[in-house]
Amino acid sequence: ARFLRSKHARTSIRAAKGRPADASTCRRPRGSMAAMRSLSIHELELMANTIRQDIIKALVRAGSGHSAGPLGMADVFTALYFHVLHIDPKRPDLPERDRLVLSNAHICPVLYATLARRGFCSVEAFHATLRAFGSPFQGHSNTHFGIGIETCGGPLGQGISQAVGMALAARLDRARWRTYCLMGDGELNEGQCWEAFLCAAKEKVHA
């Protein structure tokens, strides 16, 4: 499992400080994966702001939902989905794709907005149907609509266990894809998180 304190997530920190990201630490060749032009720091910043605008539009239309967490994480999601993750919007179930687990799934508006801008789903549909009955854009993320979401969210503390399990599965399969987990600080009160951390350290899935 790769955590946000890793060298990959520091891409967004470099962007904030105006330093170029080291693409060699974030990109690796993957023959069957769709290639995407690397965005400049300025383009990443513009995309993050566009995602923030999408979040506000959808939340205002819905009349409810979390705003602070999604807005604050826009830079991180932009760095991951537009610079780090090896994914293909045309084939969201591709076996060799990287996985991202969103444990604190109540901040899912930023995930939806980012997936929409990355081409997994419609931006307009996200604006119009967030938290509506039958919409793929519910108050907590779920996997049932095939738009690039890896896990169902809701109970806090479960995401890191799921991510560690995915990372172990990749090792057993000798697969090259990587697992990333985003979680909130409040989740750390759950004992399940610490069991997952201990397992990750013992099995060295962080390396």
Regions found by a protein language model. Give the residues of each.
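N-terminal hydrophobic or amphipathic helices/low-complexity stretches enriched
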Residues: A34-I51
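N-terminal capping segment at the start of a domain
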Residues: A48-S64
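Cofactor-binding active-site loop characterized by glycine-rich and histidine/acidic residues
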Residues: I55-A58, P70-K202
